[in-house]
């Protein structure tokens, strides 16, 4: 890379506001024979004083811009929507001693103990004045004497693990750092636990340094010593560990980045582990063990996934539940049942099928009145199971089902203040994309809303990494629906809704399909007088942020507003930060591979923004401590879009301080920050689509 040290200040103006001055450098690099101009390359040092000051100025701009908008009203509705009481399902399970609880007033859930000695075990609300120290994982030792738990600081992916004595409720002084993407797995004798650890990054690059060389460590709780348990020479591998038969045998899941393929190692010590699944040929997910072998959900020779068993005796793979027409998303072993969750193609909701553990389909079914995303199956006695259900407009419900009596009881329901599920409608259908492929879409609205060509539309999609978007309730959309808007969710290609083939149709050389699918979702709604393109705000996060950014620049001034969040906006240099190298399964390796470079440069939002083109009103959001998709992606894209914007449509940035990659859960940001972020997004959208 070379730098021509010519620096000047760029200021963009409109009739109503003035963008902060932004430094521009003549920076370029040559890649595969192509000169790539990168005038905002310096923003990759996103913790520099200049970048922080620039971000603060952008935050001030968006807040000033929204002073005369719906933001106060939206904040009020969302504050009420986020004030519901919450219990985790374990509260209703007689075999569980601990649960999560929130009265509605707390920023984070409390971790509680049930019974006569009921008590608050962990209260993350007391850990930091701004509520940005957050509880992540909890794991209780087999002897129930100890609790190991992990903490996130300001939304980053890095975790610190601490240890508590459950008899005294006192911390024991153990503190393990440099933990990331890790479970906490106890040894059967409760002498310690296993976790994933990375080499310590340089302090100045902690949020951006590439993460390699993960290894499994054992924490001895008596000595406090951290001992290396397993680590291979491949720097790109990550692991999860399970123990079979009271620690007699070890099962290690070997994962390379976010590749869909993985493999498992098995043996009785780290020195004699051997692969028991095909190496990086398919996806395997361990779900259960019995005396004969290990059960896995896999797409090995089954695009829609199936349940298989690998025998201990000879590692032979036998089929338990064969592949069906619907994609298999999960299997829960509860009592004597293997309960399979399939995606119903008509509405993306759960189609639940009961099998015995030998794979025989049973004459058992949940009542037809239940419709939604069903999950969390637990045993509550020999014949009783517990589970949860929700949809886009139905907050969480917990049910108890007596299998022998076919008796269903609603045992708890989340009540969202000011929100009555009976007042809302969900419609699921399909639309034709550019190449004729039929794509599912679900749109929701308040029954009293007059749906017409001017109705505000919030159109969301993801489209990547085999992730299936299924109906689930989140309070963030309560204000949008309450104010007369429509929430539309498109299940575009790149996800896992229709199995492996659907994923393959939206990655690498087929990635353009996801942008076409998203655009044609908007066209479908407009053609059916469900809003119009100018009353539509398009939204997506992470890979979905890329989706919004690319759809935006490929279709200038088409939408009413665009809301790319924590998106991968530089599709050339994403591999150079934290876990970016692990996204090659969907994005390729543009720095190393010429074909990947030539493809990605055409769909990269940062590189495809053109001078003097009028783009739709755009609010890009990120987290200043996002160490997964680093904020420089959003900074660079915003700077270039502000520079090149060819009309007075606003181009703005909101950078949530002390926040990381996620927004829908408390691990990434506390409740008050979520309300602030969602209020800004929706206020920006409404202000622009109403003009």
Tell what function each PLM region has:
Residues 125-138, 151-155, 170, 403-406, ...:
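Cap/lid segment of the alpha/beta-hydrolase catalytic domain
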Residues 492-691:
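Active-site-proximal cap/loop segments of hydrolase catalytic domains
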Residues 49, 53-139, 150, 237-266, ...:
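Non-catalytic accessory segments flanking enzyme active sites
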Residues 97-99, 144-147, 192-193, 250, ...:
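Hydrophobic beta-strand positions that form the internal "hydrophobic ladder"
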Residues 11-12:
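C-terminal motif of bacterial Sec signal peptides marking the signal peptidase cleavage site
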Residues 112-114, 162-167, 210-222, 264-268, ...:
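Beta-propeller blade signature
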Residues 120-184, 190:
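A conserved hydrophobic secondary-structure block that centers on an alpha-helix together
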Residues 152-153, 196-212, 343:
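Short, conserved, GDST-rich strand-edge loop motifs in beta-rich repeat architectures
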């Amino acid at each position: 890379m070379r730098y021509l040290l010519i620096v000047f200040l760029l200021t963009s103006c409109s009739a109503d506001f003035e963008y902060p001055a932004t430094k521009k450098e003549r920076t370029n690099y040559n890649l595969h024979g192509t000169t790539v101009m990168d005038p905002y390359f310096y923003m990759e040092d996103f913790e520099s004083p200049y970048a922080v000051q620039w971000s603060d100025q952008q935050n001030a701009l968006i807040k000033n811009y929204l002073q005369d908008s719906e933001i106060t009203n939206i904040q009020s509705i969302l504050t009420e929507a986020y004030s519901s009481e919450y219990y985790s399902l374990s509260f209703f399970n007689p075999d569980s001693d601990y649960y999560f609880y929130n009265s509605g007033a707390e920023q984070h859930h409390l971790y509680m103990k049930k019974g006569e000695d009921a008590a608050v075990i962990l209260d993350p609300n007391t850990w930091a004045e701004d509520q940005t120290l957050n509880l992540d994982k909890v794991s209780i030792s087999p002897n129930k004497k100890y609790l190991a738990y992990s903490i996130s600081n300001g939304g980053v992916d890095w975790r610190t693990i601490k240890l508590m004595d459950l008899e005294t409720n006192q911390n024991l002084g153990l503190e393990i750092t440099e933990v990331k993407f890790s479970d906490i797995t106890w040894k059967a004798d409760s002498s310690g636990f296993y976790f994933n650890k990375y080499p310590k990054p340089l302090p100045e690059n902690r949020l951006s340094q590439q993460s390699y060389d993960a290894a499994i460590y054992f924490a001895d709780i008596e000595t406090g010593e951290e001992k290396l348990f397993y680590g291979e020479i491949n720097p790109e591998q990550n692991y999860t560990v399970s123990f079979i038969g009271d620690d007699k045998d070890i099962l290690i899941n070997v994962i390379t980045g976010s590749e869909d393929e993985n493999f498992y190692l098995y043996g009785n010590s780290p020195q004699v582990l051997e692969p028991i699944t095909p190496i990086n040929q398919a996806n395997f997910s361990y779900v259960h063990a019995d005396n004969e072998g290990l059960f896995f959900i896999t797409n090995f020779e089954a695009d829609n996934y199936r349940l298989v068993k690998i025998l201990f005796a000879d590692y032979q793979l036998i089929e338990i539940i064969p592949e069906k027409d619907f994609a298999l998303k999960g299997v829960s072993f509860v009592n004597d049942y293997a309960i399979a969750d399939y995606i119903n193609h008509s509405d993306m909701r759960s189609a639940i099928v009961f099998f015995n553990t030998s794979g025989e389909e049973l004459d058992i079914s949940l009542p037809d009145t239940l419709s939604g995303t069903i999950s969390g199956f637990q045993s509550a006695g020999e014949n009783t199971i517990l589970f949860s259900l929700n949809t886009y407009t139905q907050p969480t419900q917990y049910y108890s089902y007596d299998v022998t009596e076919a008796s269903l009881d609603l045992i708890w329901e989340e009540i969202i203040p000011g929100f009555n599920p009976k007042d809302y409608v969900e419609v699921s259908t399909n639309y034709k994309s550019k190449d004729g492929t039929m794509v599912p879409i679900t749109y929701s609205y308040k029954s009293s809303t007059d749906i017409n060509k001017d109705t505000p539309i919030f159109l969301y999609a993801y489209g990547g990494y085999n992730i299936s978007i299924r109906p689930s309730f989140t309070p963030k959309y309560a204000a949008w629906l309450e104010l007369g808007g429509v929430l539309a969710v498109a299940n575009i290609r790149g996800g896992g809704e229709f199995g492996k083939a659907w994923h393959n149709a939206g990655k690498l050389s087929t990635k353009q399909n996801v942008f076409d699918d998203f655009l044609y979702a908007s066209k479908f709604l407009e053609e059916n007088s469900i809003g119009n393109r100018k009353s539509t705000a398009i939204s997506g996060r992470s890979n979905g942020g890329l989706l919004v950014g690319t759809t935006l620049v490929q279709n200038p001034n088409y939408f009413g507003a665009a809301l790319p969040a924590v998106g991968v906006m530089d599709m050339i240099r994403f591999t150079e930060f934290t876990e970016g190298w692990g996204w090659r399964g969907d994005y390729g390796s543009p720095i190393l591979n010429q074909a990947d470079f030539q493809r990605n440069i055409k769909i990269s939002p940062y590189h495809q923004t053109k001078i003097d083109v009028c783009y739709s009103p755009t609010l890009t959001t990120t987290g200043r401590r996002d160490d997964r998709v680093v904020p420089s992606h959003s900074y660079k894209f915003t700077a270039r879009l502000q520079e090149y914007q060819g009309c007075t449509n606003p181009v703005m940035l909101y950078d949530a301080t002390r926040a990381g990659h996620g927004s829908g859960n408390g691990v990434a940001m506390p409740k008050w920050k979520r309300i602030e972020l969602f209020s800004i997004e929706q206020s920006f959208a409404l202000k622009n689509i109403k003009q």
